[in-house]
UniProtKB/Swiss-Prot annotation:
This is Beta-ketoacyl-[acyl-carrier-protein] synthase III. GO terms for molecular function: 3-oxoacyl-[acyl-carrier-protein] synthase activity; beta-ketoacyl-acyl-carrier-protein synthase III activity. Its EC number is 2.3.1.180. The lineage of its organism: Bacteria, Bacillati, Bacillota, Clostridia, Eubacteriales. It is an enzyme of class 2 (transferase). Homodimer. Pathway: Lipid metabolism; fatty acid biosynthesis. GO terms for biological process: fatty acid biosynthetic process; secondary metabolite biosynthetic process.
Length: 326
């Protein structure tokens, strides 16, 4: 059976930068408060860009980086919790714009774990079918579901998209996954939709609950436990010692979560790549944006061992061991 490798990456973030100082003018907060509690200095917020646009731009970059044509793609999966439409799917919209006429396309929703879930689904589909190449995108326009009056959440999130292209290869690539869900704790991180149809609504605007709401303490506890356990599980499957792993690329939610996870694993936080200071939490986009940034900076060499790991609403979690092949 063929191996599956990452052969290209891409990303897109809006040009519009929102600093901590700006947020201190609209909610009761400060740069010092945000920085010391989250590690975030700024985030990118879309002006004209929507989820589809950002997904398309990241896809174009990944295709170019992989040195393939769009019609070489057999599968497109977009992980997003902020689609522009219920239908057509974001993946189908990407297919149309890039000209990937041969691809099977669909979206998935697993919040911040979405990109990991997408990789696992794609690997399974490539290994068990005639398909050879897949485009996996994490794309989010979180600014449209953030309550900009809630200082506990509005300081955390940003917009952006990241992509990776997978291909069947002879060389070692994506090795082992570990993923799961805990719906029993789902109420700790929510974003509602309209609760009723509007056929009998007498008001101009339906009351809804369509902003991100989070129990920060519970999510922190879950995140540290889920990420450390996932990494340990992947170590067991691969027989890797953490000293062999060049980087751990985790979901970019909060620097404290990463620091506590490193401490629990008895390893240095420097093993964890972080760019959340520039982009904040971009949900499903955070891991592929970081991966593309590392690829562009030349931080990864062939045969480097890396682990991607994330957690998110649902609650969900997942990780994957990869031998880098670009």
């Amino acid at each position: 059976m063929s191996n599956i490798s990452v052969i290209g990456t891409g990303s897109y973030v809006p040009n519009n930068i929102i600093t901590n100082d700006f947020l201190s003018t609209i909610v009761d907060t400060s740069d010092e408060w945000i920085r010391t509690r989250t590690g975030i200095l700024e985030r990118r917020i879309s002006k004209e860009e929507n989820t589809i646009y950002m997904a398309i731009e990241s896809a174009k970059e990944a295709i170019k980086n992989a040195n393939i044509e769009a019609n070489d793609l057999d599968l497109i999966i977009v992980a997003t919790l902020t689609p522009d439409n219920f239908m057509p799917s974001t993946a189908c919209s990407v297919q149309k714009e890039i000209g990937a006429i041969n691809a099977l396309c669909f979206d998935i929703s697993a919040a911040c774990s979405g990109f990991i879930y997408g990789l696992e689904i794609a690997c399974s589909m490539l290994k068990n079918s005639f398909r050879n190449k897949a485009l996996i995108i994490g794309a989010e326009n979180l600014s449209k579901i953030v309550d900009w009056k809630d200082r506990n959440t509005c300081v955390l999130f940003g917009d952006g998209a990241g992509a990776a292209i997978l291909s069947k290869t002879k060389e070692e690539g994506i090795l082992e996954f570990h993923s799961g869900s805990n719906g029993l704790k789902g109420e700790h991180l929510t974003c509602g939709v309209l609760k009723a149809n509007n056929i009998s609504n007498k008001n101009d605007r339906l009351e809804n609950d369509n902003f991100i709401k989070m129990n920060g303490k519970e999510i922190f506890r879950f995140a540290v436990g889920a990420m450390s356990e996932t990494i340990c599980n992947i170590q067991e499957k691969t027989k890797w010692d953490l000293s062999e792993v060049k980087y751990i690329i985790s979901h970019q939610a909060n620097s404290r979560i990463i620091e506590y996870t490193a401490k629990k694993l008895n390893t240095s936080k420097d093993k964890f790549y972080m760019n959340l200071d520039k982009y904040g939490n971009t949900s499903a986009a955070s891991i592929p944006i970081a991966l593309d940034e590392m690829n562009k900076k030349g931080l990864l060499n062939k045969q480097d061992k890396i682990i991607l790991v994330g957690f998110g609403g649902g609650l969900t979690f997942g990780g994957v061991a990869i031998v880098w092949s670009i």
